[in-house]
Amino acid sequence: MDSVAFEDVDVNFTQEEWALLDPSQKNLYRDVMWETMRNLASVGKKWKDQNIKDHYKHRGRNLRSHMLERLYQTKDSSQRGGIFSQFANQNLSKKIPGVKLCESIVYGEVSMGQSSLNRHIKDHSGHEPKKYQEYGEKPDTRNQCWKPFSSHHSFRTHEIIHTGEKLYDCKECGKTFFSLKRIRRHIITHSGYTPYKCKVCGKAFDYPSRFRTHERSHTGEKPYECKECGKAFTCITSVRRHMIKHTGDGPYKCKVCGKPFHSLSSFQVHERIHTGEKPFKCKQCGKAFSCSPTLRIHERTHTGEKPYECKQCGKAFSYLPSLRLHERIHTGEKPFVCKQCGKAFRSASTFQIHERTHTGEKPYECKECGEAFSCIPSMRRHMIKHTGEGPYKCKVCGKPFHSLSPFRVHERTHTGEKPYVCKHCGKAFVSSTSIRIHERTHTGEKPYECKQCGKAFSYLNSFRTHEMIHTGEKPFECKRCGKAFRSSSSFRLHERTHTGQKPYHCKECGKAYSCRASFQRHMLTHAEDGPPYKCMWESL
């Protein structure tokens, strides 16, 4: 009797045909093929590789690889384990081209193979391949997972899950790798050898794939597209990370919070959020970080490096996302549109903060006094009132600031610098926010509208104060007399009636005033033409 070949009993579907089957049809296919495999195993038949090369040479992946992966999806793990173990004894993984079966066994041999190869690796890299611990007898089949893989790389990566071993130790940092190729690539990061240099910004790279991905940050090319939503990406890693949003699944899952990840490195970085581990330390200031990219970005605050330059105006940035956000100033692109009022924003973060003006959500609460805020910068700014400290301090007046941008704006109050000039009237301002608000006096724009009465306002603060007329809210209460106010400015003016403070002094006559409006009215009396409004009425 002729030997039975796999092709004699196989019920095959192409990838396209398989995708069209419903779940019940797929289950029927699995049942039939499991029974077929069981029968072959029971009579001791091996799968032959007759005409495999010719028959499948135009296929991207081997037929048997597809079949095994489909069978592995069965719910009955005891069924697949038993069948796979029988075929493994017949060297199934060697008989099926392109497929390796994970046996979850710790081998006694040096895992890279022949001793001559290991000597060669040691001579060239100076790194001794590790040996797996010898366990003696083969483990029980029930503890083996038999998961199939179509590539050696995927198979070796998966084995690490069972063995916990990696093959090569880096002598510089102690990091371990499971292949010579990967440790060679890693060693370059210590040597500083970066032969691939970007012609646009001069940034150098140690590996061609990283260099090509970087080039796309300048060209805008995004060759990898999500099949689910059409979103495009510059590298395959980004699209894999994105796909988790659609599938909700990844090969690595956090045991603490359940978040899935597409790669081992991303998963390990995430774990440090829970453990608090920060192994990457800045040599300049000692600040520690959970991953090396974050450290590299931080180091630019010390070096002043700004590798990302705007082609339109030449402004340079330390971070690529900052450049991308800046470019929208030139293009006018505002992809984030508020459904409530139609206002559009350049960045997702400012859009989210804006949405809270409609919902009233204030997720950030001060631990000292309980006051709540809609965004972190507002809370940090508030915290300075309690601590009296901030990372940035004015050298002239000693005022502390929570972030660099308001600190820079404040410095201009001392230097007199006003870099933002109104195109309509020529008036200059210290910040971009101030000029945007001022421009509304020319355009008449009033983006903040009261839902109660329809009245519109140019400024958010005016709108918020107006809303309190309807709600009756008066959050600022005087501790001396109990009088309450809607706005902090009105409250501060009132406090001066108790303290007697008069911070506005006339240089002409020395007279002092408690509020700016009274002071400005007084100053008109010293003007050359006198006050602008004079009563012309003559008594009879």
Curated annotation (Swiss-Prot):
Pfam families: KRAB, zf-C2H2, zf-C2H2_4. GO terms for cellular component: nucleus. Keywords: DNA-binding, Metal-binding, Nucleus, Phosphoprotein, Repeat, Repressor, Transcription, Transcription regulation, Zinc, Zinc-finger. A zinc finger (C2H2-type) spans 140-162, 168-190, 196-218, 224-246, 252-274, 280-302, 308-330, 336-358, 364-386, 392-414, 420-442, 448-470, 476-498, 504-526. PROSITE patterns: KRAB (PS50805), ZINC_FINGER_C2H2_1 (PS00028), ZINC_FINGER_C2H2_2 (PS50157). One of its GO terms (biological process) is regulation of DNA-templated transcription. Residues 4-90 form the KRAB domain. The modification Phosphoserine is found at residue 191. Gene3D superfamilies: 6.10.140.140, Classic Zinc Finger. It is found in: Nucleus. GO terms for molecular function: DNA binding; zinc ion binding. Belongs to the krueppel C2H2-type zinc-finger protein family. May be involved in transcriptional regulation as a weak repressor when alone, or a potent one when fused with a heterologous protein containing a KRAB B-domain. This is Zinc finger protein 136.
